[in-house]
């Protein structure tokens, strides 16, 4: 505990200005974004109701004025107008379409529709979306869960960089080797420090969002019931991402390596499949048929559980238990790898993109193959006719250039 207090003081003295700016920046951006989010729902509902009144030719003296705060009676009024339009134009609402068979949906959309019908259909759909955002009582899909605070992810990544990759780029890192605790303990304490700071910042975000909600035009219909579970799951997600960010940072000697290892951590399987698929294309031609990429995508399309999010972590991003478990497994694997690399790291490797030689070889190889595959696919997309021999020569040339490029980058030591 004493060592943790010492590390906390050292990190705060070293990064206080950056941490304060980072926290204020994340709070400010999230505040503005959340305000825009609530205003969008308010305007969407009130504008939809006004458009319903116009479409039904309701006299102005019988229309309801736009309220400062939307209440239950206003929603009931909007529902009544919406139902009249649905009946008048024979519109099938989205929630009913979702339960229909594909053939029935195709028949519905195959009918000739007037411009007026399409306009009303769009108005009804917009109203339903906003109404659902405000009134859906499902704890997994309520007002707050419709809003994901993506701006906390840059905060987590920059915080991880300050504690790891940026520190390794400075001469201060050499001084840290004189700390009266081991390298692995230093890594573990930084992880705890970051998790606690993430908790504090997240609670500040929630507090500000709650105050803004209570003072918005949605206050009368807003309920906080069922939000505790959502907030806990969201916090777990942020903690998982921070573990990944700080673990990749601990294995990186500079910020460029930090970015690269995160790309590998989240895209290892997809990048590998892409590279192998490109090699298949090089050898067999552009029109050869299904590649390993095709098979991989078809396999993922059939998956719904943990395996889907493990193989493709950022696909269909949500807060499902399956996604949290998959990301948790990735975080645990990356953390274990980082722990052993930190345990055996040499101070003189700080400043390089990757501080461990075996990991450096793997990363450099994957980076070279991926860049080659990317450029090859871009270039060959302009070809009218593809010749296998020309394709092989082009691929080998691009691979040679990519290898030389990344070999140079991985051997550059950055110290400030």
Residue ranges and their predicted role:
Residues 1-23:
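Aromatic- and glycine-rich beta-strand/loop motifs that create alpha-glucan
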Residues 2, 168-177, 249-258, 339-356, ...:
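Cytoplasmic membrane-interface regions of multi-pass membrane proteins
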Residues 16-41, 105-124, 147-158, 264-271, ...:
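Hydrophobic alpha-helical transmembrane segments of multi-pass membrane transport/permease proteins
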Residues 142-172:
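Long, hydrophobic alpha-helical segments
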């Amino acid at each position: 505990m004493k060592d943790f207090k010492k590390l906390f003081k050292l990190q705060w003295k070293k990064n206080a200005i950056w941490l304060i700016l980072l926290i204020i920046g994340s709070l400010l951006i999230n505040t503005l974004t959340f305000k825009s989010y609530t205003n969008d729902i308010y305007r969407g509902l009130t504008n939809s109701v006004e458009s319903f009144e116009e479409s039904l030719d309701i006299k102005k003296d019988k229309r309801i004025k736009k309220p400062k705060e939307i209440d239950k009676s206003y929603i009931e009024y909007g529902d009544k107008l919406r139902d009249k339009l649905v009946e008048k134009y024979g519109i099938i609402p989205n929630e009913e379409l979702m339960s229909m068979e594909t053939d029935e949906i195709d028949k519905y959309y195959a009918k000739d529709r007037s411009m007026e019908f399409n306009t009303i259909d769009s108005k009804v759909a917009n109203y339903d979306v906003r109404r659902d955002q405000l009134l859906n009582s499902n704890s997994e899909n309520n007002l707050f869960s419709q809003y994901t605070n993506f701006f906390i992810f840059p905060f987590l990544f920059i915080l991880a960089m300050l504690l790891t990759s940026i520190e390794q780029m400075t001469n201060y890192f050499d001084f840290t080797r004189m700390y009266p605790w081991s390298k692995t303990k230093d890594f573990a304490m930084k992880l705890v420090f970051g998790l606690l700071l993430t908790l504090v910042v997240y609670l500040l975000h929630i507090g500000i969002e709650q105050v803004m909600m209570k003072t918005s035009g949605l206050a009368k219909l807003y309920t906080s019931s069922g939000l505790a579970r959502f907030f806990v799951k969201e916090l777990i997600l942020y903690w998982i991402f921070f573990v990944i960010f700080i673990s990749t940072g601990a294995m990186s000697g500079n910020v460029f390596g930090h970015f690269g290892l995160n790309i590998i951590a989240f895209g290892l399987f997809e990048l590998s499949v892409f590279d192998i698929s490109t090699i298949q294309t090089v050898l067999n031609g552009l029109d050869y048929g299904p590649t390993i990429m095709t098979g991989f995508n078809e396999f993922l399309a059939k998956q719904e559980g943990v395996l889907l999010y493990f193989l493709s972590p950022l696909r269909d991003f949500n807060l499902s238990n399956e996604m949290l478990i998959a990301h948790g497994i990735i975080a645990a694997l990356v953390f274990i790898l980082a722990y052993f690399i930190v345990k055996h790291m040499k101070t003189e490797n700080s400043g390089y993109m990757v501080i461990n030689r075996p990991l450096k070889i793997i990363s450099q190889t994957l980076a070279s193959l991926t860049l080659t595959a990317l450029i090859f696919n871009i270039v060959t997309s302009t070809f009218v006719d593809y010749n296998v021999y020309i394709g092989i020569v082009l691929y080998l040339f691009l691979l040679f250039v990519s290898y030389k490029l990344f070999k140079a980058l991985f051997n550059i030591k950055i110290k400030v």
